From Swiss-Prot:
Residues annotated with Phosphoserine modification: 174-175
One of the record's GO cellular component terms: nucleolus
UniProt name for this protein: Eukaryotic translation initiation factor 6
Main function: Binds to the 60S ribosomal subunit and prevents its association with the 40S ribosomal subunit to form the 80S initiation complex in the cytoplasm. Is also involved in ribosome biogenesis. Associates with pre-60S subunits in the nucleus and is involved in its nuclear export.
Quaternary structure annotation from Swiss-Prot or TrEMBL: Monomer. Associates with the 60S ribosomal subunit.
Signal sequence bounds: none
Compartments where found: Cytoplasm; Nucleus, Nucleolus
Gene: TIF6
SMART domains: eIF6 (SM00654)
UniProt keyword list: Cytoplasm, Initiation factor, Nucleus, Phosphoprotein, Protein biosynthesis, Ribosome biogenesis
Family: Belongs to the eIF-6 family.
Amino acid sequence: MATRTQFENSNEVGVFSNLTNSYCLVAVGGSENFYSAFEAELGDVIPIVHTTIAGTRIVGRMTSGNRRGLLVPTQTTDQELMHLRNSLPDSIKIQRVEERLSALGNVICCNDYVALVHPDIERETEELIADVLGVEVFRQTIAGNVLVGSYCSLSNQGGLVHPQTSIQDQEELSSLLQVPLVAGTVNRGSSVVGAGMVVNDWLSVAGLDTTAPELSVIESIFRLQDAQPDAIGGNLRDTLIETYS
């Protein structure tokens, strides 16, 4: 399922939210439409946590995470950390990261298996990413840009990268990540795909300006046409097996 929404007239959905296969963070405040886009699809499946990070609402740019863990900058307050710990499943590791490049969502792009990171990220941060998120870490650029989290959107099914990424780069990144990639845009031609949308294995939410062709590229590369959350997919399969056995 691919949908569109806005956060207080901003189409940069990936700035104000962070979506994984086991939880979703959204900024506090904002309009009801923004939350209902997530709640309609995720409400019964994974927790949706309203929070600030380091006193700001740009939760998607300040954090990076996957189904195993969540990394937050060292400026995150104790109160915010406590709120996250209380709201997220116990299996999720939450870790403060002492990193000069503190907008972690801009410098890390990850799914449940691999992470692309800014070439200049600290060695300790690289180790934390591997440890907390349980992923292989690669220092990379995308179309010459060091902000890999801003110019790439990634799930376990596929990835969307900066429109100027060369075919050679796409093939190289695709073999590193072991998922198909396509170069494209969101929000009617914006190359900042990481900030313009969020995606997990069954849902993508992009900005309201995203055109129908852009949305169909998103649905196709992330294989969202008939994707179901694991929990629901499993239940349906069991029900069908019982019905026909």
